[in-house]
Amino acid sequence: MPHKPTWENPEIDEKELLDWIRHSVQTSSNVYSHGYQGRVYLYTGKGGRKLIIKTPTGRGLMRYVRTKMLEREFKAYSKLPPMDGIPRCIGFLDGLYLVLEFVEGVPIYKAEIKDHKFFFDSFLALIKKIHAEGVAHTDLKKKDNVLVIDGKKPCIIDFGVSVIKKKGFSPLNAYLYNTSRTFDFNAWVKLKYDGKYEEMSEEDSKYYHRMLIEEIARCIREPYLSIKIALLGRK
């Protein structure tokens, strides 16, 4: 089970923050964004320190699943030591609210990257670092999950579907973890070359391993997008 969070900033009172979160949820105020896990709120404390609070939404099974995803994300952050390119996790409040340090970054699909080679070399190194700690992200192809800081530094967010490597003998976990690692490297190649795999260098090709499950997803996605575009055009 997640451990009780500790607060690094003495200006942030746990009860005060929890009251703020509950009020924000009840009044739908201070909403920063929405995601597949639920709503994201932006808290600004004394001294201007900003925190992101991720909360589950929905009812019944959907709320349970989203809460479990937030719990998994908390476990992933807890597994990782402090490192540049990963948001600092403050804690998991009341078994519902994931509290993270706010990161001033731009999603990669919107960002202007000043030094393409430096950024993607740093991004690759960051992926290798989290893998070395036994965490695979799994969902880096979703461009919202990769931020660009100051036009040059990568930051990985949203570990809700991550896979954490277990100790000891666990064949299923080992398979899932290794598959997720492959997903991460494939995503790095896709983002670096913007999906133009024919331009991939020989050096980078060693990080790309086409997987059947990705091919199936692509086959489903392309017709779906074509239908969606056609329907939007009729409006």
Residues covered by each model-derived region:
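C-lobe/activation-segment region of protein kinase-like
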Residues: 149-235
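ATP-binding glycine-rich loop module of kinase domains
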Residues: 24-78
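Conserved hydrophobic core/spine positions of the Hanks-type protein kinase catalytic domain
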Residues: 125-129
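Active-site beta-strand termini and strand-to-loop segments that position acidic
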Residues: 42-48, 101-102, 149-150
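Catalytic-loop of the protein kinase fold
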Residues: 132-149
